[in-house]
Amino acid sequence: MQESGGSSGQGGPSLCLEWKQLNYYVPDQEQSNYSFWNECRKKRELRILQDASGHMKTGDLIAILGGSGAGKTTLLAAISQRLRGNLTGDVVLNGMAMERHQMTRISSFLPQFEINVKTFTAYEHLYFMSHFKMHRRTTKAEKRQRVADLLLAVGLRDAAHTRIQQLSGGERKRLSLAEELITDPIFLFCDEPTTGLDSFSAYSVIKTLRHLCTRRRIAKHSLNQVYGEDSFETPSGESSASGSGSKSIEMEVVAESHESLLQTMRELPALGVLSNSPNGTHKKAAICSIHQPTSDIFELFTHIILMDGGRIVYQGRTEQAAKFFTDLGYELPLNCNPADFYLKTLADKEGKENAGAVLRAKYEHETDGLYSGSWLLARSYSGDYLKHVQNFKKIRWIYQVYLLMVRFMTEDLRNIRSGLIAFGFFMITAVTLSLMYSGIGGLTQRTVQDVGGSIFMLSNEMIFTFSYGVTYIFPAALPIIRREVGEGTYSLSAYYVALVLSFVPVAFFKGYVFLSVIYASIYYTRGFLLYLSMGFLMSLSAVAAVGYGVFLSSLFESDKMASECAAPFDLIFLIFGGTYMNVDTVPGLKYLSLFFYSNEALMYKFWIDIDNIDCPVNEDHPCIKTGVEVLQQGSYRNADYTYWLDCFSLVVVAVIFHIVSFGLVRRYIHRSGYY
């Protein structure tokens, strides 16, 4: 393994990432059926990684092989520092210790399953992510150029305007790879990049990685080369004229050993280097966990790592692995896939006891003292490199909020059909309530009860519609939030604020539309100002309900659990809302209810100016003569500030719900890794 000390041949020393004595522990999942006993019993830990040590240098394409549960993904996440929890050991770059934030700047992690917004096109997704992943001073033209290079480099030219949900599995995998290449990282970590792909797509993905690791040509491509010769309008409205300054694309000749498989495949061009990237003088290095690769794919890897039981039992060049096994008496059969042979040998009881132990001992012996001599001389170089990387400046927080709001609204527009269906049912409810209470007329004793019932239904419908409409949000979005926030794409606070703000215009629109249908048949005699004030209050109730719904959503990682646990909260809020019981009997508790603030403000606005209510001739029945008496009967306040105090209270309740919800989501995000 003396090769590690060499130069990259690209204008500077090689960058080498070394991991030393990595150990990872997780709690034992074996539990008793009795929760009390689970709390009292001593917690045990399982050791997932055991003294894992190794290295990778620029130019390497490494495959991590092992059976199920061998620790492949855990090792990948530990090296890339995307793993949280009880992890011990060191990760160093040319002998210098690496912090988590430094690692995320010089590396990218390609997850096993694609995590992105499915309603975006391939171009839109990459262009959107370029705003977050490129330096804040990068111009829009440079971002569009980078996206053009990426789409061509990963072979997605013809799918640039296709929505992600319509792409094939191989295309989605290559799009995910293109996203990770936006920052021009030195190290690529790929978790089973061929899973779920056919042999051709799997080969093309690994071949793309081989290109990135073995070449560093600068190849700039015009937008016309990516999107065709026709004029293409960019998101900013600019048009790329046909044939203006287009450069020919250099294509690589397919290796003879794979001509039969790829005879129709045009080779992918090398990717251009970012103008402000410190990585331009380096090859890349990629390390992939991979499950049962074909022989064609296996031959693309320059090195392999074999794992068994959380231990590394071999690391070395791909072509040298057969000799190691042969020396131990395990001859590689003719016409046999080497990867299958190695895994079968390790899985065999005899091979697991003999070959695994001997290979592990040999590996530990050869890696002892690996980073002495020339690598120590490269420390100052890697230090300068890290300083350059740390000069990266992300876009400002307020711009993150703006871009995320654009993404949320774009998703809603792309899913307009389901949105219209939901809005249709919402309006059916409004029409139904309007027909039920359309007989209200005059100011009589009957009107008091009917108006109270209609206002109660208005409040209920707005709160329940918006609270239950958002309970699914965080359980569905946690994977993408955990990954993008963990990678430093944007801050969690920016995501949360953008999410909340995106609901505000919807709340006001639906609040006034819903009230319009009912107001036209029930309250029209009271004037336009009452309509405006009631609509504003209903909209605030919807905003507060969003906070309540998001709170329920953040309590659990399952939307089903969130919906089921909402029932006791709903019951408490309804009881203390002022309709089902006299809230004066439980002073103080009424202020916990959203329904109380909403009902009180709506009732106040309707009744406070009413000075005369008709009484029946029969004096044996109680008679309410003024609007103030109506409010007093319902235990509602009648002071001049009541309406605005309730509006302010709804805002405060919403803020409290959001603060608690943000804390819960933050706990979920930082509790586990983002890989």
UniProtKB/Swiss-Prot annotation:
Reactions it catalyzes: guanine(out) + ATP + H2O = guanine(in) + ADP + phosphate + H(+); riboflavin(in) + ATP + H2O = riboflavin(out) + ADP + phosphate + H(+); (6S)-5,6,7,8-tetrahydrofolate(out) + ATP + H2O = (6S)-5,6,7,8-tetrahydrofolate(in) + ADP + phosphate + H(+)
Biased composition (Low complexity): 236-248
Annotated positions binding ATP: G66, G67, S68, G69, A70, G71, K72, T73
One example of a Gene Ontology biological process annotation: guanine transport
Region spans: Disordered: 229-249
MF annotations from Gene Ontology: ABC-type transporter activity; amine transmembrane transporter activity; ATP binding; ATP hydrolysis activity; ATPase-coupled transmembrane transporter activity; guanine transmembrane transporter activity; pigment binding
EC number(s) on file: 7.6.2.-, 7.6.2.6
InterPro entries: AAA+_ATPase, ABC2_TM, ABC_transporter-like_ATP-bd, ABC_transporter-like_CS, ABCG_dom, ABCG_transporters, P-loop_NTPase, Pigment_permease/Abcg
ABC transporter domain sequence ranges: 34-261
Membrane topology classification: Multi-pass membrane protein
Origin superkingdom: Eukaryota
Entry's localization field: Membrane
UniProt induction comment: Up-regulated during aging in intestinal stem cells.
EC main group: translocase
Family: Belongs to the ABC transporter superfamily. ABCG family. Eye pigment precursor importer (TC 3.A.1.204) subfamily.
Quaternary data: May form a heterodimer with w/white.
Physiological role: ATP-dependent transporter of the ATP-binding cassette (ABC) family which transports various molecules including bioamines, neurotransmitters and metabolic intermediates. In the eye and probably in association with w/white, required for the transport of the eye red pigment precursor, guanine, into pigment cell granules. In Malpighian tubules, involved in guanine uptake. Probably in association with w/white, involved in aging-induced intestinal stem cell proliferation in the midgut by regulating tetrahydrofolate transport.
Protein name: Protein brown
